[in-house]
Curated annotation (Swiss-Prot):
Lineage: Bacteria, Pseudomonadati, Pseudomonadota, Gammaproteobacteria, Vibrionales
HAMAP family assigned: CCA_bact_type1, CCA_bact_type2
Main function: Catalyzes the addition and repair of the essential 3'-terminal CCA sequence in tRNAs without using a nucleic acid template. Adds these three nucleotides in the order of C, C, and A to the tRNA nucleotide-73, using CTP and ATP as substrates and producing inorganic pyrophosphate. tRNA 3'-terminal CCA addition is required both for tRNA processing and repair. Also involved in tRNA surveillance by mediating tandem CCA addition to generate a CCACCA at the 3' terminus of unstable tRNAs. While stable tRNAs receive only 3'-terminal CCA, unstable tRNAs are marked with CCACCA and rapidly degraded.
Cofactor(s), names only, from the UniProt record: Mg(2+); Ni(2+)
Cofactor binding remark: Magnesium is required for nucleotidyltransferase activity.
Miscellaneous comment in the UniProt entry for this protein: A single active site specifically recognizes both ATP and CTP and is responsible for their addition.
Subunit structure, as described in the record: Monomer. Can also form homodimers and oligomers.
Pfam families: HD (PF01966), PolyA_pol (PF01743), PolyA_pol_RNAbd (PF12627)
MF (Gene Ontology): ATP binding; CCA tRNA nucleotidyltransferase activity; cyclic-nucleotide phosphodiesterase activity; magnesium ion binding; phosphatase activity; tRNA binding
Keyword Ion transport: no
GO biological process: RNA repair; tRNA 3'-terminal CCA addition
Protein name, UniProt field: Multifunctional CCA protein
Binding site for CTP: G8, R11, R91, R137, R140
Organism: Aliivibrio salmonicida (strain LFI1238) (Vibrio salmonicida (strain LFI1238))
Gene name tied to this protein: cca
Catalysis: reaction(s): a tRNA precursor + 2 CTP + ATP = a tRNA with a 3' CCA end + 3 diphosphate; a tRNA with a 3' CCA end + 2 CTP + ATP = a tRNA with a 3' CCACCA end + 3 diphosphate
């Protein structure tokens, strides 16, 4: 029995990235033997065990043979005669197919170290096309390692296109699509995840609502980049520079989905996209099973981002109406997230990335002024029942007028 450190832990160590999780592969053992050593069996599809002390995952070396459709359509063989090289051969990318012995010796039969040096994401074997999930994984790795200069090997991109055209991606479950998408949001370049999926054709299959934005024009006066899809990628990147919040980064990517269903006869104008986008976002979130925290922020940004952009023109009563709709009196922390998304939208335009965004400060000033008007003061003044709400709104409007010097 021999044990090797494998996968991401070896890769990240070689890239001088902090190793968070360690995965191990066990060669020359059986489930019975592992159980006798105190390891806890947890694998359903193949033999995986938790170490009795560290609780790290130890998987028996295995081979996989395609036996059906989708990423679960495999038959696994995990007997004691499976070699380390055979186990590494089934992995997706060469940089993930490097093992390390207990003495620190690297076993690298598929030249992963060379690809790490050359900053290449390359498939291990042509069996890559048997697993549709690998398209999303490669896109995620491209996003994660973009800051290090990694690119996808041309022959691997070609296999990704082959996988897409085979129809295999239709067998991906919504949970797996969201799992990879959400992981990509935590990278330094979430936009690369979408652009890679667009390049290989997968975006139209797994996230057609975002794919529909490409080729849709916007007014050049406001959007020098013109293409809505390109704008979305730019906004995504700006959001990642402004915040590490995953809901903010998600909302930035979907805030303009309404533009994807604007009738061509109305192009390049999209006057109703803040309203039409609501249903598109709801349907997307339902299909891919996006958590409510993400969905709620995305809907708020979709509905209100054009109003925020017009903050310098808004009347005091309009500010209060917007704050009411955002439910800020109960959830004031929402405002910062919404405004950061709007700032990313403003900056996500070709040549305008560094333009100031005074609208954010104006919205904050208006809300801070309105928030200082307290209900107890209205009640103490003798107002009762429905009068309280009316007077509270009236006082909030006056507070905004004073704060923003609005007549």
């Amino acid at each position: 029995m021999q044990i090797y450190l494998v996968g991401g832990a070896v890769r990240d160590s070689l890239l001088n990235i902090d190793v968070k999780d360690k995965d191990w592969v066990v060669v020359g053992s059986t489930p019975t033997h592992m159980n006798s050593l105190g390891y806890q069996s947890v694998g359903q599809d193949f033999p995986v065990f938790l170490h009795p002390r560290t609780k790290e995952e130890y998987a028996l070396a295995r081979t996989e043979r395609k036996s059906g459709q989708g990423y679960k359509g495999f038959t696994c063989y995990a007997e004691a005669d499976v070699t380390l090289e055979e186990d590494l051969l089934r992995r997706d990318l060469t940089i993930n197919a490097i093992a390390q012995s207990d003495k620190g010796l690297l076993i690298d039969p598929y030249h992963g170290q060379e690809d790490l040096k050359n900053r290449l994401l390359r498939h291990v074997s042509n069996a890559f096309v048997e697993d549709p999930l690998r398209v999303l994984r490669v896109a995620r790795f491209a996003a994660r390692f973009h800051y290090l200069g990694f690119t996808i090997a041309p022959e691997t991109m070609q296999l990704m296109k082959t996988l897409v055209s085979s129809g295999e991606l239709s067998h991906l479950t919504p949970e797996r699509v969201w799992q990879e998408w959400e992981k990509s949001l935590s990278s330094k370049h979430p936009n690369i995840f979408l652009s890679v999926l667009k390049e290989c054709g997968a975006l139209a299959v797994v996230l057609p609502e975002i794919d529909a934005l490409f080729g849709v024009p916007q007014p050049e006066q406001w959007h020098p980049e013109i293409d809505t899809g390109m704008h979305t990628l730019m906004v995504s990147q700006q959001a990642s520079l402004l915040s590490t919040s995953l809901p903010i980064r998600f909302a930035a990517q979907v805030h303009d989905l309404g533009k994807g269903i604007t009738p061509e006869s109305e192009w390049p104008s999209h006057k109703m996209h803040c309203h039409t986008g609501i249903k598109v976002i709801k349907n997307l979130c339902k299909r891919v099973r996006v958590p409510n925290e993400y969905k709620e922020l995305a809907l708020l940004v979709c509905e209100h981002h054009t109003n925020v952009h017009r903050a310098s023109e808004l009347r005091a009563q309009t500010f209060i109406k917007i704050f009411d709709k955002m439910d800020l009196w109960r959830k004031p922390e929402r405002l910062e997230s919404i405004l950061l998304c709007c700032q990313a939208d403003h900056a996500g335009r070709l040549g305008l990335e560094l333009n100031p965004y005074p609208q954010k400060e104006r919205m904050e000033s208006a809300f801070n002024a309105a928030q200082h008007v307290e209900v107890k003061e209205v009640v103490a003044a003798g107002f009762k029942g429905p009068e309280i709400r009316d007077e509270l709104t009236k006082r909030r409007i006056e507070a905004v007028k004073v704060a923003l010097l609005i007549n």
